[in-house]
Amino acid sequence: MSKNSLEERLAELEMRLAFQDELINTLSDQVAKQEMDIRELWDAKKMLHKQLKDISPSNIRREEEETPPPHY
């Protein structure tokens, strides 16, 4: 192989490495943002679940409030 060919291959590999580094950083930032979004959505879901429980009490009575079945 000629010296010029090796230099071209090395330059190509360096460009690919730089591109991959940039891509990894971009993907890492995106994953971090999505993790924050998921946490926010999870917190909102918990809050909505609590609000729903507070405004619509269950129609199911607790066991001690239930009358025993007729066969007892």
Swiss-Prot record:
Region: Disordered, residue numbers: 53-72
Domain of life: Bacteria
Family, per entry: Belongs to the SlyX family.
Name of the protein described by the UniProt record: Protein SlyX homolog
This protein's encoding gene: slyX
